[in-house]
């Protein structure tokens, strides 16, 4: 989380720090504003404060009956597993036993992610390579709180959950291979419409 905080400051806010001391050259994609830039370097104390803030944020609580009713949500939860979504969007992980904060040790975390990188194919690729991740590799997005979001996928390209699900399907091209999720999306598309809606209701309840 500390590195995440530091990188977000550097990349999203343009604020260098001890972990990321150099500005990124964003010239090719920028529209320059006439106002001058501020030279801001954030201290380790600021980064630690941001890290602690995120570490102790309470998770969003799922709805038991909204939308669609409890029975629909329960059916959707079961379908989420049977079609294969849960293979990557793992419902529950456990926090580490060793931590500076015992209150956070060995806790069930219902984030719906395996926190792993997966090849998603050219359809979702942003061509941004970072570390060992290629331009079509993405960490599985946690789904807790997805019911409160207005836009979906890494670039917010859609406000429709069904479109977001189907965007996981992508054939390979000369640059990237096919999406790892193709079989799962085929399973989803094969569901009766009522079961598809149950799955959407379950996601909206998170």
Question: Model-derived features: where do they sit?
Answer:
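Periplasmic c-type cytochrome electron-transfer domains
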Residues: 1-206
């Amino acid at each position: 989380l500390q590195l995440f905080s530091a990188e977000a400051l550097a990349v999203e806010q343009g604020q260098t720090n001890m972990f990321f001391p150099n500005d990124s050259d964003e010239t090719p994609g920028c529209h320059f504003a006439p106002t001058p830039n501020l030279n801001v370097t954030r201290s380790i104390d600021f980064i630690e404060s941001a890290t602690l803030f995120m570490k102790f944020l309470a998770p969003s609580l799922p709805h038991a009956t909204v939308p669609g009713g409890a029975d629909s949500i329960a059916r959707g939860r079961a379908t989420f597993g049977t079609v294969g979504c849960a293979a990557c969007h793992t419902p529950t992980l456990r926090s580490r036993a060793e931590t500076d904060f015992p209150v956070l040790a060995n806790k069930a975390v219902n984030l719906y992610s395996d926190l792993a990188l997966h090849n998603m194919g050219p359809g979702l690729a942003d061509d941004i390579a970072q570390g060992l991740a290629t331009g079509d590799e993405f960490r599985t997005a946690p789904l807790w709180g997805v019911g409160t979001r207005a836009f979906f996928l890494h670039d917010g390209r859609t406000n429709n959950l069904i479109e977001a699900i189907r965007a996981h399907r992508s054939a390979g091209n000369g640059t990237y291979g096919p999406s790892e999720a193709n079989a799962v999306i085929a399973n989803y598309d094969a569901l009766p419409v009522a079961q598809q809606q149950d799955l959407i209701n379950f996601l909206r309840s998170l």
